[in-house]
């Protein structure tokens, strides 16, 4: 990227106005919820809040694979978070994921609820929790093949 020679980055970045179309506000440079909204809670220990985007689908696939492998304690409830409507900025969702991004997982299977967010972190968390070979590192995969 080329900047003018006299360009000096500001000491404090300020968001002056929205630009970028419909989804510009989904990556806003401020934190916290914009409105109060309770999230639904189902009957299973795992509550997945997501949408059918590539990152959102990854966790659903992981849960389904765990169930197919016989991990019946991997039952989960999946709830739609419509990022087009800004539902990721609701108070309960932000309490689970302060980054206001999908997917977000609430694990109620232990004594205390655990919140896990970011698709990669959720996948690793589930792989470790269920001692699953689905996400072995290359060293672990090599060991598994021996």
Segments from the language model and where they lie:
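GST-like domain detector, emphasizing the conserved glutathione-binding G-site
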Residues: 1-138
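Single conserved hydrophobic/aromatic residue that forms the stacking wall/gate
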Residues: 136-146
């Amino acid at each position: 990227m080329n900047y003018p020679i006299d360009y000096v980055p500001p000491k404090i970045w300020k968001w002056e106005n929205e630009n970028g179309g419909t989804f510009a506000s989904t990556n806003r440079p401020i934190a916290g919820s914009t409105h109060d909204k309770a999230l639904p809670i189902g009957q299973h220990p795992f509550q997945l809040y997501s949408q059918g985007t590539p990152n959102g689908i990854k966790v659903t696939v992981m849960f389904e694979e765990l169930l197919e492998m016989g991990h019946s304690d991997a039952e989960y409830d999946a709830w739609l978070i419509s990022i087009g409507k800004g539902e990721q900025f609701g108070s309960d969702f932000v309490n689970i994921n302060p980054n206001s991004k999908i997917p977000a997982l609430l694990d109620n299977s232990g004594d205390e609820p655990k919140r896990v967010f970011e698709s990669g972190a959720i996948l690793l968390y589930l792989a470790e929790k269920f001692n699953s070979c689905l996400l072995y590192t290359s060293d672990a995969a090599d060991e598994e093949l021996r």
